[in-house]
């Protein structure tokens, strides 16, 4: 079983092991940073804190020149925090971003991280493009074209239909994960603005599975994608080894585990992003001492032709 081909050279493997040994074991059972970092985590009390402060952070890999956990293949990609390249987001004001998934790799959607600060403001997506924004850190204000305002805290989200005038503003540090897609129109069906939070969405039945599932968007045919929130307790795993036509974009919000993509098996942790092409075999198992939660994009309600 091949996990990381880049670890095949003994000197690099030994050096990486020394990095792991040199840091403290965290409360969730994964090698992590010195105790000062844990003190910060304990004091933060913030949901999804490890998305922006991952256990195995870029600073832990600074003594490994050229090393990254990121992988790009024909039918999947694992994009890890140490390989993010931040730059000003087009059309956004005072906002840095990192595009994690784009059509350049074969997807029909984009997924990016937006890092906002004081006086940051979103731009509008291109014509006929819909947007979904989820807050993983901080707080933002969504203002609609009619002037209605919605305060979005961590774990809150907004779906903006295509050509829907709006702005997302921040008065302080905030991090969003954003999905955008050119909308696939259906006659006599039109999606509407959706604003909500994860915990207010009902748990759904998952026949044959043991994970918990919430869908953040309506399941009606007006919506051509949905966003799933999936929770696994340590030791739980997908029963179905999925192979399907749908594409996925995934952000691990909490926890750690092993993700199978094709014939590769990847250790993953909060902050990691994954792209899954149509028909790539996929499977997940949660490890550690705390739950796994991930956010998952999935195209739905459209004939693949």
Predicted feature residues:
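Ligand-binding loop in jelly-roll beta-barrel domains
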Residues: 149, 156, 162-186, 278-304
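Short, conserved beta-strand element in jelly-roll/cupin
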Residues: 115-116, 126-142, 229-232, 242-258
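A short, N-terminal "cap"/entry segment at the start of jelly-roll beta-barrel domains
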Residues: 27-108, 173-225
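Extended, compositionally biased flexible segments
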Residues: 121-159
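Long compositionally biased, domain-poor regions of proteins
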Residues: 139-145, 150, 168-169, 233-235, ...
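Conserved short histidine dyad/triad with adjacent acidic residue
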Residues: 94-100, 110-127, 228-244, 278
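Cleavable N-terminal signal peptides of Sec/SRP-targeted secreted and luminal proteins
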Residues: 8-25
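Short acidic-glycine-tyrosine-enriched beta hairpin
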Residues: 146-162, 262-278
């Amino acid at each position: 079983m091949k996990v990381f081909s880049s670890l095949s050279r003994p000197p690099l493997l030994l050096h990486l092991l020394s990095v792991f040994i040199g840091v403290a074991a965290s409360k969730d059972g994964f090698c992590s940073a010195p105790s000062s970092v844990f003190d910060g985590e304990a004091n933060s009390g913030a949901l999804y804190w490890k998305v922006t402060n991952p256990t195995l952070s870029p600073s832990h890999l600074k003594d490994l020149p050229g090393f990254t956990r990121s992988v790009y293949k024909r039918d999947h990609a694992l994009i890890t925090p140490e390989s993010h390249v931040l730059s000003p987001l087009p059309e956004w004001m005072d906002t840095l971003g990192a595009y994690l998934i784009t059509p350049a790799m074969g997807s029909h959607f984009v997924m990016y991280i937006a890092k906002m600060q004081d006086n940051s403001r979103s731009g509008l997506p291109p014509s006929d493009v819909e947007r979904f924004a989820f807050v993983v850190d901080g707080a933002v204000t969504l203002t609609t074209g009619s002037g209605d305002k919605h305060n979005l805290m961590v774990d809150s989200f907004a779906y903006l239909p295509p050509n829907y005038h709006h702005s997302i503003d921040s008065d302080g540090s905030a991090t969003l994960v954003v999905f955008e897609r050119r909308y696939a129109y259906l006659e006599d069906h039109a999606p509407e603005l959706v604003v909500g939070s994860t915990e207010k969405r009902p748990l759904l039945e998952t026949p044959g599975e043991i994970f918990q599932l919430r869908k953040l968007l309506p399941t009606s045919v007006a919506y051509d994608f949905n966003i799933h929130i999936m929770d696994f307790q340590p030791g739980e795993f997908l029963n179905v080894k999925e192979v399907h036509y749908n594409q996925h974009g995934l952000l691990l919000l909490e926890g750690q585990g092993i993700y199978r993509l094709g014939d590769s098996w990847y250790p993953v942790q909060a902050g990691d992003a994954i792209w899954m092409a149509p028909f790539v075999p996929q499977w997940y198992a949660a490890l550690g001492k705390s739950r796994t939660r991930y956010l998952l994009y999935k195209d739905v309600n459209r004939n693949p032709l």
